[in-house]
Amino acid sequence: MLSNTLRSNFLKFYANRHHTIVPSSPVFPHNDPSILFTNAGMNQFKDIFLNKETVSYSRATTSQKCIRAGGKHNDLDNVGHTSRHLTFFEMLGNFSFGDYFKEQAIAFAWEVSLSVFNLDPDRIYATVHEKDDEAFALWEKHLPSERIFRLTDKDNFWSMAETGPCGYCSELLFDRGEKFGTAASPLEDTEGERFLEYWNLVFMEFNRTAEGSLLALPNKHVDTGAGLERLVSILSGTNTVFEADVLRLLISKTEQLSGKTYHADEALGAAFRVIADHTRSLSFAIADGLLPGNTERGYVLRKILRRAVNYGKRLGFTQPFLADIVPSLVDTMGEAYPELRLSLSQIQEVMTMEEENYFKSLHRGGNLLQQVLKSSSSSSIISGEDAFKLKDTYGLPLDEIALLAKDYDFTVDMETFYQLEEEAKERSRKNIAKSHSSTDTVYDSLSLGENSEFVGYNDLSCDTFIEALVSNGKQVSSLKEKEKGALILKVTPFYAEKGGQIGDSGEIFCSDGTFIVSHTTSPKAGIVIHHGEVSQGQLSQDQAVTAQVNCIRRKKIGNNHTGCHLLHKALEVTLGDHIRQAGSYVDDTKIRLDFTHPKAIAPEDLASIELLVNEKIRENHRVETREAMYSDVMNSKEIKQFFGDKYSDVVRVVSAGFSHELCGGTHAEFTGDLGYFRILKEHAVATGIRRIEAVTGREAEALAHQDNENLNEIALVLQSPRDQILNKLQNVLEERKEQAKQISELENKLIHSLLDKLIDGCQQVDDVSYLIHHLPESESHRLQQYANCLHQKIPLRLISLWTTQKNGKYIIFSRISDDLVKQGLQAKDLLKIVLTPCGGRWGGKDIFAQGSADNLPQADALNNTLWQWISTQLI
């Protein structure tokens, strides 16, 4: 594959020039809530550019997985209908953090364009910012001035936000020839089809102030991004990015599955392109730990999948098909991105389950659309509210709603629909902004000398001093008795909540006062926040204090964290290599582990998992930790790591018997410290994600004791020895089963006797046979049972039965024949007429409906009402 060659050669080029090859970060940023998805190579280096993070290298190169399908950068609606829009793409990039700047960056880009990309130098153009004379002069070393163009801020100025690092940028474009347009220069090529941008070089040299001034940065940075798919298309000479390499292979697989042939210029061409792109986006997102859902990123994934299914219907797919395309993707990209290969079964299972659910939704939505058409027959207009509900709740695409409406000579109120859609988007934007605003805390503006030094792996108590105090969201100089707030220490033994492990609690004290630490967090890298309350005295900034962790609680937390690791490994050993952690939480009382698995775990497998963990506890392995370079362990098959996580250069490896994981948490000293392990329960939390909750130590012992007590009580109730409880229960159940059978036989006899009486009460006018009858104090579910039995015995067109319950409430049930439904009638229409005057409620389906009311008309009046409906509707 050309893409594999280009990617490899690009990274090698920069690696040979002292750049560190940094693995792609996940397609979603863990610690940057400002964006839904990773949409550029620089996302994972954002904190470096903002001077919030330091790394051991000053030059880096990456091939970054990107998704643009939500938020500000959203290409979703364009995908399939243009030559180059994609939701998933790869961004090749090189970065300089205070190292080289414009001259070297431009020289590198030119050399790569010729020697790695093998582009014709006579067809390369460059743009620079209109004020960037330096970049213009540097490009003149490689290009004639007539192929260098000056553009405004709109095109050639980059900024991360309204304030902060920013700078001029320079774009490289390739002239694809007159086949793609008659524009003579990039300035005339408004569509960008002929002069195709393939690389953008950003020069971060300014800091924009709140007043809008541009101040020179002390350290200048370089951030570049080259679109791999565009380069492949250019070098392959194809009209679109879809007709070469990986995407063309996925289209070919779709051709094979659908039995249809891809033609780029035909209407079905868009369907092939959408399916190829969306399959790739979904696969990478699921491999990185995302799942379709109803909020934020999960909602976007679900939208992508449903869009692919909708286009698949145009190709004739009526059942799940996306999973069958994924192996072709893994075969071509699995070597560069091993997470695809490791997650293949998970990707396929999630896709298939989502598709199955969506096809069911579409079926329900189609039925609802038919109801909407009936209810709107007087106006011949589907309201915007109904159309929006069908799309938003049931996933029925707007174009399908419009097509069906057209078939019935209906129109859709598009203006209201789009208004409601925009209101929903605005609510979503506000919710996202609200959820993100919590991260903009006072801690971002604190002036601290250095980051907090954590010594808590080895010491649970230390002497330190207070660097800062916070109360009610503001930095303060002191905290007095009974005041709640937070402390930041120069050195701390307190572990801050992260990685699924709850933070420590304890005390911070000196001769002047004591601060009770309730919990500990880390809102930004290197800062540990101790939350709590002054129990006595007063504490002030720069004061010398002693920090003491609650040792007993810490030990319990560490034991549970080690138990979580053992459980994770036991799951993999018992169920298979597809097991991947999808989330975890450990505190001093319990373990919670979420993991990828398509179905409920069999009881015998749960027992095996529990036994295996306890076996490792009894073996009493020393829990060992060591530091290692991430580059040395990143490809290890033995050491568990999570593709959704971002790791620093130096990582911590925790080994506990057969378990080896990258982990920054605290742990037991020996596996035997856990004492005993018990699983509380196992259940689903999302499509393809299961959860196990478990306990260790005294909590596990208490659970075993409670189980023992429960067995004793059951034995007492059953009047049976404990070792014979199961047999006794089976005998009791068999007896109940036999009794239920006898009761059922008696009920059937009574029903048949009653049916004979009901049949005698049937009436017929012309060709309409019907029954209206009152059954005193019958159970409500019996009404439907009687109606169904009657329907099987004689061809009644309408049955209406009602009963009075002991509490005085009336229940009424109606059933109509299939031929009446085909005429457009519904059983609930009848109940509506009967129950509306007396404030009743009703619901049901076309054929049968049930309602209730506190009062009903007298029997004669009720019969008259029902008869009037029959005479007007049926006779």
Curated annotation (Swiss-Prot):
User: What EC number(s) does this enzyme carry?
Assistant: 6.1.1.7
Per UniProt, the keywords (alphabetical) are: Aminoacyl-tRNA synthetase, ATP-binding, Cytoplasm, Ligase, Metal-binding, Nucleotide-binding, Protein biosynthesis, RNA-binding, tRNA-binding, Zinc
Superkingdom is: Bacteria
**Binding-site positions, Zn(2+):** 561, 565, 663, 667
Q: Which reaction does it catalyse?
A: tRNA(Ala) + L-alanine + ATP = L-alanyl-tRNA(Ala) + AMP + diphosphate
Q: Which CDD domains match?
A: AlaRS_core (cd00673)
What detail does the entry give on cofactor binding? Binds 1 zinc ion per subunit.
InterPro entries in UniProt: aa-tRNA-synth_II/BPL/LPL, Ala-tRNA-lgiase_IIc, Ala-tRNA-ligase_IIc_anticod-bd, Ala-tRNA-synth_IIc_core, Ala-tRNA-synth_IIc_N, Ala-tRNA_ligase, Ala_tRNA_ligase_euk/bac, DHHA1_dom
Q: Where in the cell is it found?
A: Cytoplasm
Q: What class of enzyme is it?
A: ligase
Q: What is this protein called?
A: Alanine--tRNA ligase
Question: Whose protein is this, by species?
Answer: Chlamydia caviae (strain ATCC VR-813 / DSM 19441 / 03DC25 / GPIC) (Chlamydophila caviae)
